[in-house]
Amino acid sequence: MGVSGSGKSTLAEGLSAALGLPMKDGDELHLPESVAKMSAGIALEDADRWPWLDRIANYLANSEQNPQGKSGAIVACSALKLIYRDRIRQQAGPVVFLFLDGQPDLIKQRMQGRKGHYMQAGLLDSQLQTLEKPGADERDIIALSINQSVSNLLQNAIVKLVAYQEDSLSHDGSLVQAPSLNKH
């Protein structure tokens, strides 16, 4: 999760390959009219996001076990507000959000270097204003700084996910509502 240009899709692709889990870019789940708005430089409103969040949650809730016996899926999506994350949690079940945090100047630079993406760099300010950074009460969120190489970011994400899962185990070794590595 994070604003556009923070590296969500790149990290999700790397995690998918490393963990053997299916990955979906949340951009693919937007309704056509929402894509048209963003392409025109118009920020989305909550009403535009509800169907998109429902599609994300549905994808996660219906992820199946892969041939290696792992269940879960990875979705790259912004999930900027607590209410958006709560909607995904309520519909998809236990999830882990990876919050990609970085300086606006770095993110804007990345966005300006992208080719063929409908999200314009001019919408970054709107996303930063909308962003509700996760609080300490959101225990299913792992914060990661984007001020590092992609390979280091991927390695740090995996290390923190493993630690998160280990922390989710009860003392007798049984899983206590630990996610099946559903990542956003």
What spans do the regions from the language model cover?
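P-loop (Walker A) phosphate-binding loop of NTP-binding proteins
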Residues: 3
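Conserved lysine of the Walker
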Residues: 8
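Conserved nucleotide-binding/hydrolysis micro-motifs of P-loop NTPases
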Residues: 29-30, 79-81, 102-106, 149
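Small-molecule kinase domains that catalyze NTP-dependent phosphoryl transfer to phosphate-bearing small molecules
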Residues: 113-156, 165
